[in-house]
Amino acid sequence: MERPHPSSIPTTPGVYLYKDSQGRIIYVGKARNLRKRVLSYFRDGLVITPKTKAMMNHANLLETISTNTEKEALLLEASLIKKHRPRYNIVLRDDKQYLLFRIQKGIPFPRLEIVRQSYKDNAVYFGPFTSGTSVRDTWKFIHKIFPLRRCSDKVFNNRIRPCLYFYLQQCLAPCTEEVDPKDYAVLIQKVELFLSGKSKELVELLQKDMLYASEALEFEKAATLRDQIQAIKHTIERQSVVLPEGGDMDVIGIAVVNNGLALGFLFVREGKLLDGRTFFWPGLELDDGPELLGSFLSQFYSPISSIPPRIIVPWLPESTNNKDEISEDTFETLKYVLEDIRNSTVRIEVPKNIIESNLVDIAVTNAREAVQTKLGEPMSAKLAKVFHTDKPIFRIECVDVSHISGTNTRVGMVVFEDSQPLKNDYRIYSTTEDNSPFIKGDDYAALASWAKRRIQSGPPWADLVLIDGGKGQINAVQRVFNEHHLKDVFILAGIAKARNEEGRVDRRAGNIGDKIFVVGRMNPLTLKEGSPELLFLQYVRDTAHNFVLGKHRKARKNTALLGELLRIPGIGQATAKLLWSHFKTVEAMTCATIKDLEAIPGIGEAKARMLAERLQSLRNQ
């Protein structure tokens, strides 16, 4: 790529995008001064990392986006990296949100919820946690010793008698006012102490309550409190205290492992090591460490994150003009962004004492051991060998078609990155939306319709597009891709199901009868029976099949319910549309109360009573 003329680049803060010859974004960067940063790439004698050198060799086009401040540039950079996943950026591949406990404030009888997002609402959050199993086990443990309500708000507001948990002495039945709000508030206070890690204060409080109960001759209550104390003490014994003085912080360690960089992340809350996580980026060197650290922090934390007051990092960057390093100015900007999210002070700093240094060492050790344990040859490299390509097959988009006797045709697409499902990118396509009446029962036309709409969505493109089908299906898709000059952007393949002697589909895992067809190849690929590559491709195919089938069943159920609605006297198309637009799902509609129905404009009290009765009968069918 030729050096751009300085006058073509603004001197404002902003984001710059390098694109390849096909227009794909291959790198996104941010700068306080766009002209100064971009021109630095073309300075003679500049020492750059191999990754940056490779990026410049592939770059064909430069675009810039100006922002008002460097903070805005940092946020835009993180957003573009998450959206486009450029090849030469350090991308945080794990987009899933961590789990949190949530307790709503301002209501008399809140429940303990498990959520993936936190908001600036009238609630308190505890976490984060990475393991769904451990979170659910903790939730069960809390309900076992603290009898909170478990039901949803809708069930709670409509219950007229206590549930089974009340009779098992695992719920105080606030739904039927069996407990005073003040007593329930005390219970919530104890749960908050437990989740905050303040177990010592909680035990002292319970011991006082037990003493008062004994003095009042309430021996059954005292026995319950005794059991709670014993259960909590047993839990405390298993917790690892890493900060004797307490405190909340996240700790990061970075290690060079197996020709790549591994990052270990520890969650420390109330002085206790709550949880941990490891990440790995192959192909990075130690010189990429500063960029990795800055990219990770800007992508990992978001407006729905749980951000502690301190983030301990292995090093802080020095002020530098080398564009391959993240400068202290960038860290300062990142600090301001995190403080805006947290609405309080955030310090990004190196360890201050031997205890914190040891925590960084633990994070490094965890990262190194996790990578060495899990890392054989990655599946992306194995699949590259299967499909005879030099480029690792990192992103896979798999497509399947479902219909019933040619009606309600749906095309489902699932996405895998780094061998993991990327559920936020799953999509369902209703092929009737492009006004193609000939599609009924025609899988080829449905797939062609999907291909057109997938192209309209744009990048990020897959390394492998996998179709649930054979040569006919992949040829239908290939024609569309060729028309839009996308022939060489990705590999297009089909996986055809094996069939038994009776001609029926045989879905046995690893079955060698499953054939994998590739565009441009006459014969199917030969994969060893039961090989990891074949098992993985079958798993991806089956995931797509189950996804579209589940959506199709839901659509059929909704269609059936619509027919039932129209058969109810007094309900026409207009009322049916009102119900659909208000409730969105079958479950919500059939659980609607008279009060819920009356709230819909155009439905009066008499009609609401009639609808509630009929919808209830539909739910019981």
Curated annotation (Swiss-Prot):
GO terms for biological process: nucleotide-excision repair; SOS response. Interacts with UvrB in an incision complex. InterPro entries: GIY-YIG_endonuc, GIY-YIG_endonuc_sf, GIY-YIG_UvrC_Cho, Hlx-hairpin-Hlx_DNA-bd_motif, RuvA_2-like, UVR_dom, UVR_dom_sf, UvrABC_protein_C. It comes from Lawsonia intracellularis (strain PHE/MN1-00). CDD domains: GIY-YIG_UvrC_Cho. The keyword Hydrolase does not apply. Its main location: cytoplasm. This is UvrABC system protein C. It is found in: Cytoplasm.
